């Protein structure tokens, strides 16, 4: 399936395990990845130019190293020089559409999407924070920060799969 598509693997891992938006992934260059590997966290510029730093796990680090080996220094990691960014994004989205049934959770009837991976990250991160002793309010604000959102109502959309009484309501 994606055996040699380390670019796609990395983008999917960044959504699933770090909550990055698709455009944030496709802006990443080699210098950003080198710093992320040193700091175990990636700094991205999100919507409205807001900068945030998100921790990366070992799966992301491994995928970053593999893609870094294939990318000339000073270049974008997920976009080749001869391809516009929007076309590279479309290729990833087509790949997801073509292979989503092979990787979909058996318990889910919803089709996998890139943005859906971000939702999964948010819900799991929230639950992890709660399990580690954070209050629902503190966990909600931490997930908001990690996603690059400030408004509680937007974060609530991401946390819709979490039980009603378990998340901060506006």
Residues covered by each model-derived region:
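C-terminal catalytic core of tyrosine-transesterase DNA break-rejoin enzymes
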Residues: 13, 118-153, 157
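Short functional hotspots where side chains directly engage DNA or cofactors
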Residues: 40-44, 113, 138-170
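Alpha-helix N-cap/N′ positions at the starts of helices
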Residues: 3-7, 117, 138
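Basic, Lys/Arg- and aromatic-enriched nucleic-acid-binding interface segment
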Residues: 1-18, 22
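Conserved tyrosine-mediated DNA breakage-rejoining catalytic core shared by Y-recombinases
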Residues: 27-64
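Alpha-helix termini
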Residues: 2, 33-38, 101-106, 129-137
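Active-site/catalytic core of tyrosine-dependent DNA strand-transfer enzymes
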Residues: 57-128
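Short, cationic motifs built from Arg/Lys/His that form the positively charged side of catalytic pockets
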Residues: 7, 21, 52, 64-65, ...
């Amino acid at each position: 399936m994606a055996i040699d598509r380390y670019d796609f693997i990395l983008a999917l891992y960044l959504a699933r395990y770090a909550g990055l938006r698709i455009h944030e992934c496709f802006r990443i260059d080699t210098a950003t990845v080198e710093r992320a590997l040193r700091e175990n966290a990636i700094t991205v510029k999100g919507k409205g130019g807001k900068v945030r730093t998100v921790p990366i796990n070992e799966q992301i680090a491994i995928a970053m190293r593999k893609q870094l080996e294939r990318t000339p220094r000073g270049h974008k990691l997920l976009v080749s020089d001869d391809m516009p960014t929007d076309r590279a994004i479309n290729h990833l989205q087509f790949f997801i559409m073509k292979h989503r049934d092979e990787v979909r959770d058996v318990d889910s009837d919803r089709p996998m999407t890139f943005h859906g991976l971000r939702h999964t990250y948010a819900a799991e991160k929230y639950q992890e924070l709660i399990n580690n002793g954070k209050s629902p309010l503190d966990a909600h604000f931490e997930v908001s920060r990690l996603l690059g959102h400030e408004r509680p109502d937007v974060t609530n959309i991401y946390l819709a799969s979490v039980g009603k009484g378990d998340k901060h309501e506006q």
